[in-house]
């Protein structure tokens, strides 16, 4: 566990904590986290996860803007529920993206193509949902983190294992807080 990996994980934890609070500073701290994490993931030969960090970078810029100006009349975006039709489409898209990513990654020197494909596809959807402040992003993050903790333990990436364990707790907390925010704004 390198000091660089620890700092990257720390920025990730701060970013997610701030997200649970709907604090706009979650996005700039995310930019630092994903920039640093991409280097570590590249060294671990988790290539889809490296690409995912690039996606997170772009969505962090998008989310920063959306949270500030994505609401009605360019106001602050409020927590909302996803429409069922969109939710169903996202499930189908996630399944296709997982299969497609797995197919591509299985033909590369990726160290864990299936798990990397799952992380990639599901995280893309969850991050976009978070940028749009859909409360349902949090149970998706809970599921991802339940997979990530044992995975990073198995590959001896202990800083990221700890990060994802903390993310799991934060995702549960964020889910509760965003649901309360949704009820309060109704």
Sequence positions of predicted segments:
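Polytopic alpha-helical membrane-helix bundles and their juxtamembrane interface segments
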Residues: 1-22, 26, 33, 67-72, ...
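Individual alpha-helical transmembrane segments in multi-pass integral membrane proteins
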Residues: 7, 49-58, 164-165
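Helix-loop junctions on the outward
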Residues: 22-25, 37-52
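Interfacial loop at the N-terminal end of multi-pass membrane proteins
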Residues: 39-40, 44-46, 56-59, 74-80
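Membrane-water interface of transmembrane alpha-helices
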Residues: 54-71
């Amino acid at each position: 566990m390198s000091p660089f990996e620890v700092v990257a994980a720390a920025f990730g934890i701060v970013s997610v904590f701030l997200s649970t609070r709907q604090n706009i500073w979650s996005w700039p701290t995310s930019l630092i986290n994903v920039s640093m994490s991409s280097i570590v993931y590249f060294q671990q030969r988790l290539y889809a996860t490296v690409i995912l960090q690039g996606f997170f970078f772009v969505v962090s810029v998008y989310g920063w803007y959306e949270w500030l100006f994505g609401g009605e009349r360019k106001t602050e975006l409020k927590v909302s529920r996803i429409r069922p039709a969109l939710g169903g489409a996202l499930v189908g898209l996630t399944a296709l993206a997982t299969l497609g990513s797995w197919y591509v990654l299985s033909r590369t020197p990726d160290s864990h193509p299936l798990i990397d494909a799952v992380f990639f596809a599901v995280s893309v959807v969850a991050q976009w949902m978070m940028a749009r402040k859909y409360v349902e992003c949090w149970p998706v993050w809970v599921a991802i983190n339940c997979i990530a903790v044992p995975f990073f333990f198995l590959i001896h990436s202990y800083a990221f294992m700890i990060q994802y364990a903390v993310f799991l707790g934060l995702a549960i907390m964020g889910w509760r807080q965003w649901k309360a925010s949704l009820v309060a704004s109704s």
